[in-house]
């Protein structure tokens, strides 16, 4: 931000109001005509001033939402306007650091010396200025790089119920991706999980090229909402430097819940399942800031916590329409020890055709067809009622379950390059094609394939590769 913009953000005269009442976490102030989004401080009689933000108006009063608890606030306290807009200090020195929603270090180290500034809430790149996405981003996870290939600048959702392993999956991406910079936003996390994620899921190597923005569940809703904007602003800064950035947010659901608190406190009417309109207005504003620009790219993965395993609950349903694809984590697969528990048939990457070769896409289609054929007949197979030879495709699907699951399962510390993921996928396709040809020939001759049993195995296929359990 240039010096002119900085000067314009500072009010030329002091604007002062007084506290009239509090309601929940909001403070109503009289004689304080500050704009929405402006920053103010409440002068308490004891303790330092309390920072707050203008979130709306009610009758003749201005409604503020504080960044900390309201302890010490009383009727008549003076409220002073401090700034009408916000910016962040940024720079390469943020790499390897853990910061809060205000950009301050919380990792016990000295504050980084940052010389650059960026706007806290930037406008997304103009649609006509966005280049097409044509290059793939390697996540290091075979199930994604092989069957759900993502492009640099794509926005994906990771949908799962609690305890299925989405945090572990995001940590694997941060460790194994080929992105230049990783920005991780932990919104509404339990306090104990922050260090666990940094030390166990991310590791020293992942942290060295990452910026971690943290707002735990005990912090006010405004802080949790700002954490998402702070992380996105930092990702935008590195994108402007020509970097390919990977933004990981856990989770977009908690961001929506925090905005619901703010919206209801500001007097918005509750709509679908108690969510006010501002939630559904704010999510696309946040998501559209990511993507590709003429300088670089921000590839974003947003974790979405699915309430009661219902994929059609309001937040999940709205987010699917905003993003360029989704990765669905299955509790059923997780219960079988299949990690990462990615349900390939329920997942989708809309940009995969633009960033993969024809051969790769055909191989992915073949594996999907085999997985679908097995799922359609799984009940018959599990009770031994399926008769081998009745359907050559199902016969091959049964035979290929072990190698396919071996491809999809992956240990946390295991990294698969793009070449390895693609090469293994093509080998699976060739093996499936050979088996299908033999099965079709045997079916035409009225015989079972050589060495095949007459009935499909009754046992459920397990994951042959050991993997870490989710949190």
State the predicted function of each range:
Residues 1-3, 24-27, 41, 59-60, ...:
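A broad, low-specificity signal for short, low-complexity segments enriched in glycine/proline
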Residues 1-139:
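Acidic-enriched and Gly/Ser
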Residues 2-3, 80, 139-144, 231, ...:
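Phosphate-interacting basic helix/loop segments used at nucleotide- and nucleic-acid interfaces
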Residues 77-79, 93, 106-154, 167-172, ...:
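P-loop NTPase nucleotide-binding/switch module
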Residues 146-147, 153-471:
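P-loop NTPase catalytic core
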């Amino acid at each position: 931000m240039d010096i002119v913009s900085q000067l314009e953000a500072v009010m030329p005269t002091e604007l002062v109001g007084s506290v009239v009442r509090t309601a929940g976490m909001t403070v109503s102030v009289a004689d304080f005509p500050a704009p929405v989004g402006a920053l103010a401080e409440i002068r308490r009689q004891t303790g330092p001033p309390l920072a707050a933000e203008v979130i709306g108006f009610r009758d003749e009063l201005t409604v503020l939402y504080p960044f900390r608890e309201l302890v010490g606030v009383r009727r008549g306290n003076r409220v002073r306007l401090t700034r009408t807009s916000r910016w962040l200090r940024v720079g390469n020195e943020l790499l390897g650091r853990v910061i809060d929603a205000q950009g301050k270090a919380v990792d016990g180290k000295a504050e980084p010396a940052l010389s650059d500034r960026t706007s806290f809430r930037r406008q997304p790149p103009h649609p006509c200025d966005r280049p097409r996405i044509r290059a793939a981003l390697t996540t290091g996870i075979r199930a994604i790089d092989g069957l759900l290939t993502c492009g640099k600048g794509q926005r994906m959702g990771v949908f799962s119920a609690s305890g299925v392993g989405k945090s572990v999956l995001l940590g694997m991406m941060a460790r194994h991706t080929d992105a230049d910079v990783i920005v991780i936003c932990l919104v509404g996390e339990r306090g104990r999980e922050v260090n666990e994620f940094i030390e166990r899921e991310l590791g020293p190597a992942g942290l060295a090229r990452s910026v971690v923005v943290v707002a735990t569940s005990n912090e006010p809703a405004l802080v949790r909402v700002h954490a998402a904007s702070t992380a996105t602003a930092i990702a935008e800064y590195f994108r402007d430097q020509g970097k390919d950035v990977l933004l990981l947010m856990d989770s977009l659901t908690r961001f929506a819940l925090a905005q619901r608190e703010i919206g209801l406190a500001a007097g918005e009417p509750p709509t679908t399942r108690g969510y006010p309109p501002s939630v559904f207005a704010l999510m696309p504003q946040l998501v559209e800031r990511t993507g590709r620009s003429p300088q670089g790219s921000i590839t974003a993965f947003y974790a979405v916590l699915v309430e009661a395993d219902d994929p059609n609950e309001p937040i999940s349903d709205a987010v699917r329409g905003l993003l360029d694809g989704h990765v669905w984590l299955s509790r059923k697969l997780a219960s079988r020890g299949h990690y990462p528990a990615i349900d390939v048939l329920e997942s989708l990457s809309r940009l995969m055709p633009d960033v993969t070769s024809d051969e790769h896409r055909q191989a992915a289609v073949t594996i999907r067809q085999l997985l679908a054929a097995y799922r359609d007949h799984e009940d018959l197979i599990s009770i031994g009622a399926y008769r081998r030879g009745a359907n050559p495709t199902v016969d091959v699907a049964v035979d290929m379950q072990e190698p396919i699951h071996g491809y999809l399962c992956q240990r946390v510390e295991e990294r698969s390059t793009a070449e390895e993921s693609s090469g293994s996928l093509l080998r699976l396709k060739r093996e499936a094609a050979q088996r299908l040809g033999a099965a079709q020939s045997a079916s035409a001759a009225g015989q079972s394939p050589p060495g095949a049993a007459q009935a499909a195995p009754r046992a459920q296929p397990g994951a042959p590769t050991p993997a870490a359990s989710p949190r």
